[in-house]
Amino acid sequence: MICIGIDVAKDKHDCCILDSDGTIRADCITIPNNMDGFKQLLQTIRDCTKKSDKIKVGLEATGHYSYNILGFLLDNGLPTYVINPLHTNLYRNSLSLRKTKTDRVDARTIATMLLSDVDLKSYTDTAYHNEELKSLTRYRFDKVRERAKLKQSVSRLVTILFPELEKLVPSLHIASVYALLSEYPGAKQISEIHLTKLTNLLATASKGRYGKDKAIQIRDAARTSIGSVMPAKFLELKHTIKLIRELTSEIDEIEVSIQKIMDELNPPILSIPGVGIQSAAMILAEIGDFSNFESPDKILAYAGCSPSTYQSGKLTNCYAHMEKRGSRYLRYALYNTTKYVCHWNPVFAEYLAKKRAEGKHYNVALSHATKKLVRLIYALQKSGKAYLVAA
């Protein structure tokens, strides 16, 4: 058995190679983060091993820094283990009382961790390509949050420039309102528009939903508006709406790419009422290979949804707060999906109502429903069977 620990960094990687006896075959080699460095590492591994040797390569999950070297190792057929940094930190502290942490020490710790035969599962080629879906879903998540902040800015600016408008439309964030404000961002400008022009603008943007009556209503409100005349805010509002439109176009493009992958996967969890394409994609992308998890509880822990526990002597915590460690994207996807599932699925709606009847806070009851949903998702994905709605 040959164990290779790699401490990943931005510009260089530190490597340590141990054999099954714990003897150092190559101590703390430093390679640059480029193709020459990767080839140097591969050659060093070949020089230190025989064809009959079983090889394990371990590295920490360091996000985008580890992505390229991970792909190189997998392409060259080396069994690679991606380890949670929390685990390596705890393991290193268990080996020594000294607070020594260097790249070389980390590389040796990872190699020793592999040698100790702790319960680790190798990173599969399927998991590597699953990163494509994860990249898309996380990218969409960030874009949606960015757009939400811009929408808040629109609401703030409208409150300053034309506060009466919000009561005349179902939402400020609809095509007809954006079309109006992108051309006439203030109440004073809207009040001076010719009625025919305003009617045509609203009718075109709303696809016929709004006509002359709505145009008169908006123009009359603009003429008596308390909105301020601030050219700087006018410009900010027009630019903000432009950015929202661009982000919406980008999000639509991302969703098309996600849809293509999900059409190929056709996962069983889509058969659960209330689970949509985007939510399912994020859940699957963050969990990855379900065989890496022995039980649904492991997935909950990975998402940081498990209750934290604290006990010392006679002291035991009365209110177990959520751990909130692990993937925040998975935690977000699970909780938001649970809300929709509880709305559309009678079984989950009844379960949520039961927990609420027991006196639990809504968020606590929802966390119980989330655990139930994770158990269902785990069962469906492991069995490959679709969800059957009870008659």
Where are these regions (language model features)?
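A detector of single, family-specific signature residues
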Residues: 1-391
